[in-house]
Amino acid sequence: MLIDGHGRTVDYLRVSVTERCNFRCQYCMPEKPFSWVPKENLLSFEELFLFMKVAMDEGVNKIRITGGEPLLREDLDSFIKMIHDYKPDIDLALTTNAYLLPQTAQKLKDAGLKRLNISLDSLKPEVAHQIAQKDVLGQVLKGIDKALEVGLGVKINMVPLKGINDNEILDVMEYCMDRNIKIRFIEYMENRHALEALKGMHGKEILSKVKEKYTIHALGREGASPSFNYTIEENGYEFGLIDPHKHDFCESCNRIRLTAEGFLIPCLYFDEALSIAEAVKKGDIEEASQVLATVLKDKPKENRWIEGELEEGQEVSSRAFYETGG
């Protein structure tokens, strides 16, 4: 069992396999010159897997593959199969924009993937284009349909932005209702890599939009999830709200993150990280385990909003979210 320096059980590892993405979403990585990590600096699947085995052997039972856009990494299904074959009962999920799912969903399912978290910020082609800076909606919807068709579990994430897609909260939620998919509204998190003009909706504003049509009741958080859940009285549908500015989910935080070049990150809201790259490149399991232990010991107790270090509008970290998968 993995325990951090504040007595929390850590059993969830998020693994970024690439920082690259085929979208340029305004809240994450809008058009600008990027200093991509050279391909030769990325850890191989075998190197990533060596560390993941250490983590799984010591208590990790939930893994999410992220990016960037993870489906851009070649032979991702073989990596999924490595993980599944090593620990078939692992809760294995992937975060994606769904653009490449029409041609990859079946392979991912066959490899052992269980669930997908998919970003869907608009059902209007022109708004989806505005956010992603690419004509994406038709392909994304096909990807969602394909994922459901092959039997993958699906959750939808939406980032409501003022003046852009804030009038679609009910539309996107009802799209999910019709397909028995859970939606989670994610409050926009300020960062230096997003467009400066963006303004996100606060959690209470998102809930107010839902209340314009439905009666809702709070359910609370499920386990260590950062999502605060609600149910709709009229039909029993459940949805979630991830509101890092207001809801203190740090006390039950159970996750750490590994980047594609081997940095182990204890908290998304801080820059601190340690590299496991040297250890896994030489196959040193003991050293990799020691790095993991150090990161757990130094994992912050609370995020920086809760500590009062940040005021509204300030960024959480200089590290781009596309480097860590959020």
Swiss-Prot record:
Residue positions binding [4Fe-4S] cluster 1: 21, 25, 28
Binding annotation for S-adenosyl-L-methionine: 27, 68, 119, 189
Record's cofactor remark: Binds 2 [4Fe-4S] clusters. Binds 1 [4Fe-4S] cluster coordinated with 3 cysteines and an exchangeable S-adenosyl-L-methionine and 1 [4Fe-4S] cluster coordinated with 3 cysteines and the GTP-derived substrate.
Entry's Gene Ontology molecular function annotations: 4 iron, 4 sulfur cluster binding; cyclic pyranopterin monophosphate synthase activity; GTP 3',8'-cyclase activity; GTP binding; metal ion binding; S-adenosyl-L-methionine binding
Protein EC: 4.1.99.22
Domain of life of the organism encoding this protein: Bacteria
SMART domains: Elp3 (SM00729)
Annotated pathway: Cofactor biosynthesis; molybdopterin biosynthesis
Nucleotide-binding recorded as keyword: yes
GO terms for biological process, alphabetical: Mo-molybdopterin cofactor biosynthetic process
Start and end residues of each Radical SAM core domain: 5-227
Necessary cofactors: [4Fe-4S] cluster
Residue numbers binding GTP: 14, 64, 95, 155, 255-257
InterPro entries assigned to the protein according to its UniProt record, in alphabetical order: Aldolase_TIM, Elp3/MiaA/NifB-like_rSAM, MoaA, MoaA_NifB_PqqE_Fe-S-bd_CS, MoaA_twitch, MoCo_biosynth_MoaA/MoaC, rSAM
Residues where [4Fe-4S] cluster 2 binds: 250, 253, 267
Keywords: 4Fe-4S, GTP-binding, Iron, Iron-sulfur, Lyase, Metal-binding, Molybdenum cofactor biosynthesis, Nucleotide-binding, S-adenosyl-L-methionine
Catalytic activity entry: GTP + AH2 + S-adenosyl-L-methionine = (8S)-3',8-cyclo-7,8-dihydroguanosine 5'-triphosphate + 5'-deoxyadenosine + L-methionine + A + H(+)
Known function: Catalyzes the cyclization of GTP to (8S)-3',8-cyclo-7,8-dihydroguanosine 5'-triphosphate.
Subunit structure, as described in the record: Monomer and homodimer.
Record NCBIfam families: moaA (TIGR02666)
Annotated family: Belongs to the radical SAM superfamily. MoaA family.
Protein name, UniProt field: GTP 3',8-cyclase
Species of origin: Sulfurovum sp. (strain NBC37-1)
Gene of this entry: moaA
